[in-house]
Amino acid sequence: MEADALSPVGLGLLLLPFLVTLLAALCVRCRELPVSYDSTSTESLYPRSILIKPPQITVPRTPAVSYPLVTSFPPLRQPDLLPIPRSPQPLGGSHRMPSSQQNSDDANSVASYENQEPACKNVDADEDEDDYPNGYLVVLPDSSPAAVPVVSSAPVPSNPDLGDSAFSVESCEDYVNVPESEESAEASLDGSREYVNVSPEQQPVTRAELASVNSQEVEDEGEEEGVDGEEAPDYENLQELN
């Protein structure tokens, strides 16, 4: 009868104090040993016989390099530089440079004395415009004949003396062969027989007279060559006319 009277509720009430004391003991134990619990847990996970070593990382060592000693000197003072005159520039479209960069450019710049190519090109263009104002060349038509000086060719005689005398009479009226006389000898430079200006007092020698005189000289020269066997000079002044 007593065994039937014990129910699950009674059994629970009997076991309740035992469970409470067990939980209290566990809580106190946990509070007192937190570090030891962690160490024991890690040891339980990894047995002592097996040791895991971390991988060793080898870093290559660079050899020690000896650098030379560097001695610092105070900066040298630059000599005073004179400002270089520059051409004025328009203010409207001018591009301002920083002051530091402009000073460095002034210090390093050197005056150049070279001819500018664009200026030469402009001069050539101005000359072309002056020569051809409209830009076109003036071409003459084929119908208009070109003005070419016509030189009349005189017949060349067989005798060189006659040719020279005729040429002097026809082309050059100022200089003619003058027969030998005292006036011509005095008018020449050193008394030699040369071409001299004809004075207005002397009468001009006609062609017929010159031709006759030259033919006589040629005949005389031929006779002298037959007798003496020597060559006479190619050119001689005319003899005095009577």
UniProtKB/Swiss-Prot annotation:
Residues 136-139 are annotated as: Interaction with PLCG1. The modification Phosphothreonine is found at T40. Residues 29-242 are cytoplasmic. Residues 1-4 are extracellular. A lipid is attached at C27, C30 (S-palmitoyl cysteine). The modification Phosphoserine is found at S41, S44, S87, S104, S109, S112, S199, S212, S215. One of its GO terms (cellular component) is plasma membrane. Expressed in T-cells and mast cells. This is Linker for activation of T-cells family member 1. It comes from Mus musculus. The modification Phosphotyrosine is found at Y175, Y235.
